[in-house]
């Protein structure tokens, strides 16, 4: 049966979107600030419009049919376009009040968010920022639900359905305390580098090998890693009170008193940091301004 567009209205599409996201009539009703019977009635109308059950009852909530899943993205796109139509085009950063949600690692917190926040507070004091951990497996779903607006990741982690733009290329340097036995050297030798005890950062936790070890293996060498931590933020404190050295991204070494930076004695492949965002916020004036500020403040 062919759907008559005259039987559809915006509220029905909003109800369908809420049901697809929440998978529960009760939670969809709460999200829409409607009663449960009202949402059930809207679901009945939606079923008539699309000539499909759309959802079937489950032990907990409802399960979408294949037809409902096919409608998910088009419905979100329509609602986003309508929302954009209703929003004023002008954006005044000085008076704007909004919240932006950014997914970032602790590395990106220091390298990107710190300078971004300094500029944001000066130019747009009414904008709030929520920084959340990166969950690569859930990125697409988080963007679709509106849980995050921007993610700071590497290209290999970027879902294909997101907008992406390169932020910068990062390189690795060697970090140690100022009075470390190797700090007097103008350049590390491969022998002295490999003879030291090393610390590395493993986001998954517990790994004792990384890109440095891959580079060493390529030239037939190895090192001894005696400490593996899951955060870059604790590493400077550890290096200040020990003879450990560590290979870290260069942008993490700014403003670290008591520590010295030296180039590594071999080529270690760096990485590209990118910014990704969803079509939902792609054309929004406020989000465009925030993204441009992020790019302009990246060091």
Identify the function of each model-found stretch.
Residues 160-166, 170, 233-282:
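Beta-alpha-beta core module
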Residues 47-66:
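A short LG(V/I)-centered, amphipathic sequence patch enriched
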Residues 135-140, 144-148, 153-154, 204-262:
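Hydrophobic hinge/microswitch elements
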Residues 49-50, 71-93:
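Alpha-helical linker/hinge and terminal dimerization helices associated
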């Amino acid at each position: 049966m062919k759907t008559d567009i005259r039987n559809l209205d915006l509220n029905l599409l909003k109800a369908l979107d809420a049901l697809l996201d929440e998978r529960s009539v009760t939670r969809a009703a709460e999200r829409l600030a409607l009663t449960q019977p009202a949402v059930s009635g809207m679901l009945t109308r939606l079923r008539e419009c699309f000539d499909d059950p759309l959802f079937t009852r489950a032990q907990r909530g409802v399960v979408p049919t294949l037809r409902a899943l096919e409608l998910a993205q088009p419905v979100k796109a329509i609602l986003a376009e309508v929302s954009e139509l209703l929003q004023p085009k002008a954006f005044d950063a000085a008076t704007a009040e909004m919240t932006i949600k950014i997914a970032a690692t602790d590395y990106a917190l220091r390298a990107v968010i710190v300078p971004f926040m300094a500029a944001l507070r000066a130019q747009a004091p009414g904008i709030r920022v929520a920084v959340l951990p990166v969950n690569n497996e859930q990125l697409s779903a988080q963007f679709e639900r509106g849980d995050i607006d921007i993610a700071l990741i590497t290209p290999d982690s970027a879902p294909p359905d997101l907008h992406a733009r390169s932020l910068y290329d990062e390189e690795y340097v060697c970090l140690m305390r100022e009075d470390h036995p190797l700090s007097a050297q103008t350049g590390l030798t491969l022998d002295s580098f490999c003879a030291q005890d090393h610390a590395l950062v493993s986001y998954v936790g517990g790994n004792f090998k990384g890109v440095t070890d891959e580079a060493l293996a390529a030239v037939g060498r190895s090192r001894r890693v005696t400490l593996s931590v899951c955060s870059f933020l604790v590493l400077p404190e550890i290096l200040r009170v020990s003879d450990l050295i560590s290979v870290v991204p260069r942008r993490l070494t700014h403003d670290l008193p008591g520590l010295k930076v030296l180039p590594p004695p071999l080529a270690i492949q760096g990485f590209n940091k990118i910014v990704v965002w969803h079509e939902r916020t792609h054309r929004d004036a406020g989000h465009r301004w925030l993204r441009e500020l992020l790019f302009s403040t990246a060091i």
